[in-house]
């Protein structure tokens, strides 16, 4: 004991500068050693950690944990020169982070598959514990909050609960009941002799009434029947009934369908082109029981020639026609240009006075690495820059929205206008203009970052300086061209620079610019439209989705690599403004080879985006990306809008149908469109499940 006291005294009180500043760790077995930073527990790990906090604090307070008493004194002996050890620890932390990101990437792929094909009610940020628990429950096990897992014990006088799932079976319930009774009669004696050796699941609730077997005294009372045949037959009966009930419940939902009116019905001077043709078009839509129509209100037309001079006369005439047919109306605040390979002869640019400003100051437009400008929409970096005749970008948007709200106040009061969609980027979607065909982009190219104008570069440099790394204040130089593939670039390739310190910094800043723009505009949209529903369109960027980097999503502004959920952060911002999300559903099924070449996964992307929105409590609507579809295309859209057997019964709040031309010119789609609308309304149901 005397020796031990001397040792402790020497250790805690020594101040000799000649001693080794890095003492031997074996001499101090109780010293706290640096460990890699642990991951924040989620799911069951979080519950277990919370349960263990109180005992741990008691142990500390009572001095029962080894090494607590000498911790302070021990730290004093190692205070000098540990620079090399610190660098090694930092390297080990980084290696641990890389291993963790790789593990999370594998987990995210497993979660996507389970959500898509297994109908498991997994949260968007589920971890492996949640996956194992869901699989265990599906197999009939019980899983407690602390992770304790066990088979259900015998519970007399309680009904056995079997997991329900949809099945495909040609057998009717009556046939299954007959099979069950036959199995019971043939196995009754052997089962009663051997019931103690069977599984511990209680089957007291399974009994046969005397009326089912007249004259047979054995069935005058309820008895435990543990026959395998009885179990399977009755479980099949329950599964069939549950599937029928759940399918009918899902099919009965009423999803409103809106038809998008063609773009060219309002000319560049703000006048209605063909009133009689529009009337005929609306008559066709009314005959199909369409709930309403969607019309683009183009900034480049209404405020096309002079700032703050708004021409609404053509839209007033159009809205009066829509009111005559008693159709609802959704309007789009279209702050982008229209035109391209699929637009025909219709071209709608940004306002002429904006283009004139752009000639003197081209940095008001998005710019790629080679200095080429995109005229699809205004640069988000000028949202708060007074470069538009004394107004900022968001002031221009707000003035336009406020003018519309004032001009058509009577339609809002009547309830004719049910929602307003806010255009937030290229094609009216919340995304960067990263895929311009006029600059050579070809599907499935990864696109290019749009941040090389002076305003964006100043923002990037300021952010880099605040981090203490001024040399990070520039865009990537090795991210390829518009039509490049991920593996062809240093930045997007497997374990490329996108996942380096600089890559994560840049991608976070790039995506935050998108989120910040959405927040700036939506805050003013809520002021302009008050209680009216606000809609924001989210793109479907499904190519390169099977790569680790998700390169196409990154250039479009969604920081969504395989080890990170980029959509939840966007939806958190949209949730603050009670926004309804409109998701552009992917196009028709492509050949497996085409998907493999594009590394595309439209189904996986759809499930991630839709479930991320639902997890945040957002309503979600849909829009088809194709112009005319057959019966198979209709079924795919219906399955997305009204998912079968969803545990929470979620479904789309509306659906917008885009058409290639007026219905009077595209009558070949008429029968399929009629079927599609009836299915969305729940008027007809698919009994083949």
UniProtKB/Swiss-Prot annotation:
Chain intervals with Gly residues compositional bias: 66-83
A GO MF term: DNA-binding transcription factor activity
Domain of life: Eukaryota
Spans annotated as Disordered: 1-100
Top class in the EC scheme: hydrolase
InterPro entries: BES1_N, Glyco_hydro_14, Glycoside_hydrolase_SF
Annotated compartments: Cytoplasm
GO BP term, pick one: polysaccharide catabolic process
Biased composition (Low complexity): 1-12, 27-38
Pfam families on file: BES1_N, Glyco_hydro_14
Residue positions of the active site: 429 (proton donor), 623 (proton acceptor)
Keywords per UniProt: Carbohydrate metabolism, Cytoplasm, Glycosidase, Hydrolase, Polysaccharide degradation
Gene Ontology cellular-component annotations: cytoplasm; nucleus
Record-stated family: Belongs to the glycosyl hydrolase 14 family.
Name of the protein described by the UniProt record: Beta-amylase 8
